[in-house]
Amino acid sequence: MTNLLPEMAEIWQQTLNWQPTDSQQARFQQLYELILEGNRQLNLTRITEPQEFWEKHLWDSLRGVAPQQQLISFLPVGASVIDIGTGAGFPGVPVAIIAPNSTMTLVDSTRKKIAFIESILKELGLTNAKTLVSRAEEIGQQPQHREQYDVALIRAVGTASACAEYTLPLLKLGGLAVIYRGTWTEEETTSLENAVRQLGGTVELIDNFTTPLTNSVRHCLYLRKVAKTPANFPRAVGVPTQKPI
C-alpha cells in the first residue's frame, strides 16, 4: 500500500496564497516515495509519516521562498538558485518543482547523498536542477560560482553567521539569501547584523511564523546582497563554524 501525501489545498492557499498544480502534486508524491525508498540504504530523514513529511519537508521548504506568505513574486523567471547543504534535497528539490523556469544547483559534501539526489532528479524529470559535490567555503572562492546566483537557500546548517558567510559570497549584487531557522532571538539578530555587514549584506527581513499542522515555531532570515563581499570571505573549510564572524 502506497503512503499517500495529503493534498492540503486549503492550507497551501491560506499560508502561501498558492496551490500546487496536479502535475506538481504528483511530483511531490513521487518525491515522497523516492525518499522512503532511499531511506532504506541512506539515512536521509527521520520524517517519513505522510502528514509530517508534508509539513516539515514540503511546506517548510516552500514557506521559505514565500516571505510574508507571498510565493509567486519571489522567484523571478530565469532565477539562478543554489541550495547549500541540501542533504535529502530540501529545500531545493521542492523549489525546483514549483519554479520550472529557474535553475537550481543542489550542493552537498556527501557524495552518496548527491548520487541519490541525481537519481531523484532523473526520476522526476527535473531538467532545471543539477548537483554539485562540494562545500560552500570552496565554491564561494571559485569564479564559476562566486557572485553567480540570484537566490541562495540554506536550511539547518550551522550558526546564522556561518550561513551568512556561506551564502553571501555566492550572490550577485541584489541577490537574496534565505536562512531557515527554528527559534530566533533579538540577541541573535544583533550578532547576525554585525556579521552580515562585513559580508556585503543587510538583514532585510526576519519572518516568524508557525507551521500549519503542529504549530511549531519557525523563522526565515532574508539577507540582501548590497555590496561586494570582501575577497577573504568565505574563509577556509570549517573556519566559519569554528570562528564565527
Curated annotation (Swiss-Prot):
Q: Any idea which GO molecular function terms this record carries?
A: rRNA (guanine-N7-)-methyltransferase activity
* A Pfam short name: GidB
What's one GO-annotated cellular component? cytosol
Where is this chain primarily localised?
cytoplasm
Tell me which UniProt keywords the record has, alphabetically.
Answer: Cytoplasm, Methyltransferase, rRNA processing, S-adenosyl-L-methionine, Transferase
**What EC number(s) does the entry state?**
2.1.1.-
What EC class does the entry list? transferase
List residues binding S-adenosyl-L-methionine.
85, 90, 108-110, 136-137, 155
Location of the protein in the cell: Cytoplasm
PANTHER family with a match to the protein in the record = S-ADENOSYL-L-METHIONINE-DEPENDENT METHYLTRANSFERASES SUPERFAMILY PROTEIN (PTHR31760:SF0)
**Family affiliation:** Belongs to the methyltransferase superfamily. RNA methyltransferase RsmG family.
Protein role: Specifically methylates the N7 position of a guanine in 16S rRNA.
Q: What is this protein called?
A: Ribosomal RNA small subunit methyltransferase G
Which organism is this entry from?
Answer: Trichormus variabilis (strain ATCC 29413 / PCC 7937) (Anabaena variabilis)
